């Protein structure tokens, strides 16, 4: 029992904690792109926290469309500025926000794996209640933690027209099974109980069940060598939804957990992660030293987007 508590506490330290900027990652902003504009737009979550978001756009964006972007665990929406800018440069207006417990948003912690779906539900409820967005065609694009919510959101908001889910886990339970395999299998029950108690309404959603009876146009993108959201999630979705004409699958190779990146970007990102882990062990580093460390990497190359994948994404989003 003592060891079980340690395991659960270790899991809490990853999935039930706050994620703030500790200056060991670089984040692009709208100011890094000429003519790129943003407008602050915060909303209250059902948990009572203020979630900070922004509308991003270029001049002459499509006024009949809105894309909501849902980020992965921890780093907040600015970790996806390249993706957001890519969507906006194609003519879309994008609303992106930081989840509960992340960066600019309130909350003592991220409140577990299902919180992204809870937040996205609150986000869309807010948008739908705002007259300035009345009648808009709304799509959702998400990655990882944000792709779990993207995969399941049509069960809560059937009017969503299109989704693009990149590297999304199909359910909280399936992810717990993968985190706690082999000798750790015995701790699944305790961890799943934690997730259920943290988010009883949203922790039982399963993407196959959510999409089976949905007419949302869906593009589900995975990488065959993803070690975080493994190939099995793709296989579960493919087996359960392959007969659905509104759902399309894209499986790429050698992209790890970032299927929309170039292969070179994925390799550079792995080099950075190893260097960051080594740098983080140094004690009492100064702000200047951290800035110098980050400046030694080519962040444009490290976040370079794969044009072939984006052609698929835009073909899906643009489809009438």
Q: How would you label these PLM feature ranges?
A:
Residues 73-85, 99, 232:
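The serine-hydrolase catalytic nucleophile loop
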Residues 84-106:
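Conserved alpha/beta-hydrolase
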Residues 1-44, 51-54, 276-290:
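An N-terminal hydrophobic leader/cap segment in hydrolases
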């Amino acid at each position: 029992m003592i060891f079980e508590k340690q395991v659960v506490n270790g899991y809490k330290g990853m999935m039930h904690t706050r994620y703030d900027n500790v200056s060991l990652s670089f984040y692009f902003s709208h100011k890094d792109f000429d003519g790129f504009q943003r407008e602050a737009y915060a909303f209250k979550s059902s948990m009572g926290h203020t979630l900070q978001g922004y509308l991003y756009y270029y001049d002459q964006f499509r006024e009949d469309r809105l894309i909501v972007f849902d980020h992965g665990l921890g780093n907040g929406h600015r970790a996806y500025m390249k993706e957001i800018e890519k969507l906006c440069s194609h003519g879309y207006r994008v609303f992106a926000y930081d989840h509960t417990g992340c960066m600019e948003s309130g909350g003592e912690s991220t409140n577990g794996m299902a919180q992204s779906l809870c937040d996205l539900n609150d986000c869309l409820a807010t948008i739908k209640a705002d007259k300035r967005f009345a009648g808009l065609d709304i799509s959702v694009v998400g990655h990882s933690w944000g792709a779990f919510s993207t995969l399941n959101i049509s069960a809560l908001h059937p009017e969503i027209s299109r989704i693009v889910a990149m590297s999304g886990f199909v359910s909280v339970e399936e992810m717990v099974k993968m985190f706690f395999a082999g000798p750790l299998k015995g701790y699944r029950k305790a961890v799943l109980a934690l997730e259920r108690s943290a988010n009883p309404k949203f922790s039982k959603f399963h993407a196959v069940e959510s999409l089976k009876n949905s007419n949302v146009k869906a593009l589900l993108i995975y990488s065959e060598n993803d070690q975080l959201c493994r190939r099995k999630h793709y296989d579960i979705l493919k087996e359960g939804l392959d007969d659905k004409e509104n759902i399309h699958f894209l499986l790429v190779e050698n992209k790890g957990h970032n299927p929309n990146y170039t292969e070179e970007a994925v390799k550079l990102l792995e080099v950075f992660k190893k260097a960051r882990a080594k740098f983080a062990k140094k004690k009492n580093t100064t702000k200047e030293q951290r800035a110098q460390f980050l400046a030694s990497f080519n962040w444009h190359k490290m976040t370079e987007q794969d044009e072939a994948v984006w052609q698929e994404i835009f073909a899906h989003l643009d489809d009438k």
